[in-house]
Swiss-Prot record:
Catalyzes the interconversion of 2-phosphoglycerate and 3-phosphoglycerate. HAMAP family: PGAM_GpmA (MF_01039). Pathway: Carbohydrate degradation; glycolysis; pyruvate from D-glyceraldehyde 3-phosphate: step 3/5. Homodimer. The gene is gpmA. The record marks H183 as: Transition state stabilizer. Substrate binds at residues 9-16, 22-23, 61, 88-91, 99, 115-116, 184-185. This is 2,3-bisphosphoglycerate-dependent phosphoglycerate mutase. Belongs to the phosphoglycerate mutase family. BPG-dependent PGAM subfamily.
Length: 249
């Protein structure tokens, strides 16, 4: 039996548009981002996908993308689970900074390492910083020591995998079709795990906003195939645009 899993990065956010490091900052979708959510829903509808359950983060750009896509799918009624473990990677002291200005200051190669390397985190956010997640009531029930002040992709994967094993994988093994709407780096972490991508290869992976990525898995959740829905060239161009965000102007 083929299991189906769709990974969907949220639509364009205001800070995507502004080219700023976002991380755990809870920013809104742009008008384009809301349109991308609807377009993603249409692509999934055209594919004939009928989901049994959906998962998302506790950040509204992902939540609102999921809501827009499900409305277009006429599957608003689906049970939705929200977890901080699907949040974007925490960008530490870079959060809120302009990516191009940061590249001009520190060099494009350093910014690429911070953005796309596997195990090198950006400079940490101090725990006394008002933006640290320990001061956000949505994380009030969590162990303060579990809340990051910065993350690499490696530590993001460590955060995401328990949710995969405890929540998503059992549903897939039960034959359910699952939609996960999350963020560039939490989805890169899942992609790396599912496709057994090397630490070096993951550096070059960029996930575009608002384009569903369909995985077909076997009974053991090994990947049989994966592809972006819609025009492959459009997905390629969108991924290249993500890669260019970390370059100096």
């Amino acid at each position: 039996m083929t299991r189906k899993l769709v990974l969907l990065r949220h639509g364009q956010s205001q800070w995507n548009l502004d080219n700023r490091f976002t991380g755990w900052v809870d920013v809104e979708l742009t008008d384009q981002g809301r349109q991308e959510a609807v377009a993603a829903g249409k692509l999934m509808k055209d594919e004939g996908l009928q989901f049994d359950v959906a998962h998302t983060s506790v950040l509204k750009r992902a939540i609102h993308t999921l809501q827009g896509a499900l409305k277009e799918l006429d599957q608003d009624w689906l049970p939705v689970s929200k977890s901080w473990r699907l949040n974007e990677r925490h960008y530490g002291g870079l959060q809120g900074l302009d990516k191009a200005e940061t590249a001009a200051k520190h060099g494009e190669e350093q910014v690429k390492i911070w953005r796309r390397s596997y195990d090198i985190p950006p400079p940490a956010m101090d725990v006394d910083d008002p933006g640290h997640p320990c001061h956000d009531r949505r994380y009030a029930t969590l162990d303060r020591n579990a809340l990051p002040g910065t993350e690499s992709l490696a530590t993001t994967l460590v955060r995401v995998l328990p949710y995969w094993h405890d929540a998503i994988a059992p549903q897939l093994k039960a034959g359910q079709t699952v939609l996960v709407t999350a963020h560039g780096n939490s989805l890169r972490a899942l992609y790396k795990y599912l496709n057994d991508v090397s630490n070096e290869q993951i550096l070059e992976l960029n996930i575009p906003t608002g384009i569903p990525l369909l995985f077909e898995l076997d009974d053991n959740l090994q990947v049989r195939s994966f592809r972006y829905l819609g025009d492959p060239e459009a997905a390629k161009r969108a991924a290249e645009a993500v890669a260019n965000q970390g370059k100096a102007k």
